[in-house]
Regions:
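N-terminal mature-domain region immediately after signal-peptide cleavage
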Residues: 3-6, 28-358, 362-370
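Cleavable N-terminal signal peptides of Sec/SRP-targeted secreted and luminal proteins
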Residues: 10-31
Length: 370
């Protein structure tokens, strides 16, 4: 019978999240998904990322079967954005063998950005309007995020060939780079026709690469917004209603005869209810398959809820709860850009860990305090 592993507190920053990696007793748990659609079918899309020898590839509509079996295809995706029945869009992304892992992960991000570009714009519009009095993050916060991204790239360049975790971090950044490129193609296509989308009639993409990086880091921004005084929370001592607002998430683990069940409730703001259930099959790139409760533009969960199946019998469920820490001085002393964001450390652990204890050890390295 599987049992919970050790968990690790985040020692720095405003919040302490408890990320609980659990060994799964049921082999098929990474196929976990929300209840099936109860309404009529919605029109979905299938796309493929085709590698081009001369450089950047492109997404193209998949009009028939084939997927990874087609020449030059490094990743495929299917997406159904219908949320009326139960609130969830569905995204499935598969990497294809025959290319190096970075090209596959770039392709995985590309097809996701291409099919969910409009949803990414809508999610950021909701987020920025709700979180920033000026409607956009302050310049100092953007500079901090840019510095953190630059530091992460520098570490990958310096250590990827000798350290597996930095090699995996390189794949995470390739995933993000692909998301940006796919979104840009999506925006270009939507901007060329007045289809009612947010890109219609616009000369260029609504979201620049750094904004997409911030969109993908909204969990970490919960601390950083307050640190830079650009969020509605501001700085200093938090009133009781603010404390209550940031006490996030509940997790349930139940042991039954011959099985272990896990459930999670995320306490998200109403503006964050653009939700997407994602299935990532990165078997050919990373030896992992993940089922993730997520949102548009996020390459992780943020809730957090993951079910992970990996080579060698790896079976993990990862859930997050939050104990908030409201200490502005502590935040300013310990949070710096020479670190890895929470979602990056969680992704590293999901991709590399062979068990719960190793998961927590990977997660604590280069802790950003966010």
């Amino acid at each position: 019978m599987a049992r919970p592993a050790l968990y690790e507190h985040r020692r720095a920053g405003r919040r302490r999240r408890l990320l609980l990696p659990l060994l799964l007793a049921a082999a098929g748990a990474a196929g976990a998904a929300p209840p099936p659609l109860r309404g009529g079918p919605c029109q979905g899309r299938r796309v493929a990322y085709r590698h081009r020898a001369e450089g950047l590839g492109a997404a193209e509509e998949e009009l028939g079967a084939g997927g990874c079996g087609r020449p030059g295809v490094a990743a495929v995706a299917s997406f159904n954005g219908c949320t009326a029945a139960d609130g969830w869009g569905r995204l499935s992304v598969t990497t294809c063998a025959g290319f190096d892992a970075r090209e596959q992960m770039f392709g995985a991000g590309y097809v996701e950005g291409f099919v969910t570009g409009l949803q990414m714009e809508l999610y950021w519009a909701n987020y920025a309007a709700a979180e920033y009095p000026a409607g956009a993050p302050p310049a100092a916060l953007r500079s901090w995020m840019a510095a953190q991204l630059d530091w992460a790239r520098e570490q990958v360049d310096a250590h990827a060939e000798s350290e597996p975790r930095w090699a995996a971090m390189g794949l995470i950044l390739a995933h993000y780079d692909g998301l940006v490129a796919g979104y840009n193609q999506s925006s270009l296509q939507r901007g060329g026709a007045d289809d009612g989308g947010s890109a219609a009639g616009r000369a260029g993409p609504l979201l620049d690469p750094l904004t997409i990086y911030m969109l993908g880091s909204v969990g970490d921004l919960e601390e950083l917004n307050g640190m830079f005084g650009g969020g509605l929370r501001g700085a200093g001592s938090a009133p009781r209603e603010e404390v209550d607002r940031l006490m996030d998430c509940s997790a349930l683990v139940k042991v039954t005869e011959g099985d272990l069940q896990a459930a999670h409730a995320t306490w998200r703001s109403y503006y964050a209810m653009l939700r997407t259930w994602k299935r990532y099959d990165f078997t050919s790139a990373l030896g992992r398959r993940l089922s993730v409760a997520s949102s548009p533009g996020l390459l992780h969960s943020k809730d957090d809820f993951y079910a992970v199946v990996g080579d060698g019998g790896v079976r993990l469920v990862v859930m997050e709860t939050t104990n908030s820490v409201f200490n502005q001085t502590h935040l300013e002393e310990h949070v710096h850009p020479e670190s890895l964001l929470s979602w990056q450390r969680a992704s590293l652990a999901n991709y590399l860990a062979q068990g719960p204890f190793e998961w927590t050890q990977l997660f604590t390295r280069h802790n950003s305090g966010t």
